[in-house]
């Protein structure tokens, strides 16, 4: 809780109600977030599964795939009313450092909208439009973090065409 000192009163406190968020990338639809009653059990489950995984430096592709699923799961739990993506990005930087990778928060800051949108897509499912969880953008983000800084992260490629009746929107131009 000390990292939340001098912030909003609700900072660092699990949310006490269910929520929805209108997502621009989904034409106003929302991800289905975890029921607030289950936040702690979901986080305990995901953290206990991930903490037992070990990766050699040669297994970076496996790490990227696992990291995308793990991050998606804890983000979809959406523990707090505000600040979930920022909190998770800091946590992932610390986790990657623990695993021996030299990373900082710059790429998360410089591509914050892409990162958030990739988390949305990895957590979104809509059978009516034949849309399933898409981890590819999140995998690409982690590839950029760990392997190839030259990878382009373009928000305009992330919109869900089926939700816009094939009328492609212009996504916000923030990184």
Residue ranges and their predicted role:
Residues 1-175:
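FIC/Doc superfamily catalytic core
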